[in-house]
């Protein structure tokens, strides 16, 4: 089993992130026009409800499984036993979850009225459990994960344009989304025999997993709660139209966040492995570089979403979603906030086995988000939901930075603050000037302004010899010279 370098894994995960970006980028403009805000709102509402059941079945395995597998990846016997123990726990819990879910569809009026949609959406629970994605990430098989995911997304891409034709096709669209995101779980399950030994162990130890899984479970349910409670409350209080506005803005924000956090997904298993083997110098070096990466990448994306919120919404969702513009501008701040909290939480607290603090921070955020939602959504709708989530995310970051204050020198000393500020300032000035003075089609103005925004930003960083950028360029130049 070959373990690739962090750079290779990052490249693969970035390719995966790009594919995750392209799928909604290409399909959502079409789907949003066909299904309308009401149709997309129904799908988002169903998915938010199903997500709660999925996290009960998964029981915190997403991050715990990665860490547990990364720590024993060099011992096939221990890895096989660990995977079987975790998977059996998940399968038992999934059985109970499905019983409750089906009872909900039968007896809850809001679910019963869309029975077909919720039955289809419920497949997400099964696919998530049998997919054992945490194993493949734990042993850093990002090449396999990426290629497999791209194939399934391509099939889903074809299905969207061939099967979603009218406003009543929202249930079919829900199935396609599930197929694209977690449908490959059965392929993972089939390939499992190539990675671990499928046999009975006489000394199964389920108990050792329960406490950390419970901590991760509470964390996950709190995250899902404060993320999806906004959609649920919008649906119950304001109706599907406001859900559609919020969902469109949230989708655009999510694409940006996934780009910024793509490195963190790769580093969790590697950092867990370094700590398990007392390789602290490598641990600190990667954390410093990760912080620089987040600052350099996330800040221009935040500014971009604020400056270009209107054209982004019009191009990606259409004029029916003008109500998404202000929510997107508010949610844009989350790109930077989550970038850093992903670093402090996923890349640091979990490998350091301090996941209880991650749990505390998320529970605090869930309470804050719930209270703000109840206050703001009745009056401000989607905008209020966006503000609530943004404040909740900020509270997570503040708490985690306080817990990890001993690492502040390692994290923040290498960031080129002035170079980034100068680059952003010039990019903003150029973009605003172009928007004011170019008298062309709005789409052309947007494409030109957006392109020059990033060109100016990167150009200033290069001219000012920003260390992180120059290190990457030197490594690329070195590889090209060798070849």
Predicted stretch roles:
Residues 432-483:
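Membrane-proximal transmembrane or re-entrant/amphipathic helices at the cytosolic face
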Residues 1-25, 77-80, 203-219, 281, ...:
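N-terminal membrane topogenesis motif
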Residues 126-148, 333-364:
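Membrane-interface junctions at transmembrane-helix termini in multi-pass inner-membrane proteins
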Residues 4-63, 98, 102, 157, ...:
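Signature of the first transmembrane helix
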Residues 104-121, 305-337:
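Interfacial segments at transmembrane-helix termini and the short loops linking adjacent helices
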Residues 28-29, 58-74, 249, 254-291, ...:
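Helix-loop junctions and terminal segments of transmembrane helices
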Residues 122, 146-194, 212, 363-368, ...:
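Hydrophobic alpha-helical transmembrane segments
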Residues 1-2, 6, 143, 170-177, ...:
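Interhelical loop/hinge segments that connect adjacent transmembrane helices in multipass membrane
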